[in-house]
Amino acid sequence: FDLANNYGHPSNGLAEKNFGQALKDCLGTYRDELVISTKAGYDMWPGPYGNWGSRKYLMASLDQSLTRMGLDYVDIFYHHRPDPETPIEETMGALCDIVSSGKALYVGLSNYKEEETRKAVKILKENGTPCLIHQPRYNMLERWVEDGLLSALDENGEIVVDAVRYCIDGKYACACPSISRQPIQPESK
């Protein structure tokens, strides 16, 4: 299950809250068989520590995510996007401490470009926390990962998970509610 602190409409965190309810109602007995991930990095609350990659934001965000889902830990905690202001050492240090605390088993990156990924992975490895996975936007329309990122990931042994944001032919759009991020389109021919 792939979640993030800012997923949900009409309010951030609603996807995690709904998932937490489903986990409580019917999936809880399967927890050891589930891989649950969440992310932090986008706008979550107003103020200087409401987004990006500061230690304060990442720690607080994960604590809130765990509360919404009713969990003690997640399998994977991603940093959702690089932070142009916070030193990467602070962001990666926070991820290492999150794993050390037992609140996440593994860490991942999302939307990091090649050079950012190389720096982040190096810092994580130096601190004994390997980067398990990278989730870029990669599809027929967004192929930027082919400009070096895939090679960097292959060198370090990370898994790439495609975050497909587009349904080219609209085949599944008719099943989406009107408030979905996926626009409703007529059935393709």
Tell me the role of every PLM-derived stretch.
Residues 1, 74, 107:
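Glycine-centered flexible beta-alpha turn that most often forms the glycine-rich phosphate-binding loop
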Residues 2-35, 183:
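N-terminal binding-site loop/beta-alpha segment at the start of enzyme catalytic domains
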Residues 22-35, 66-70, 96-99, 121-128:
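Acidic (Asp/Glu)-rich catalytic clusters
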Residues 31-44, 135-137:
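A short, structured active-site edge motif that brings together acidic residues
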Residues 43-59, 80-86:
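Active-site mouth loops of central-metabolism enzymes
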Residues 52-69, 90-93, 117-121:
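Short, acidic/polar
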Residues 66-87:
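Active-site groove signature of glycoside hydrolases
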Residues 82-189:
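Beta/alpha (TIM)-barrel catalytic core signal, keyed to glycine-rich beta->alpha loops juxtaposed to Asp/Glu
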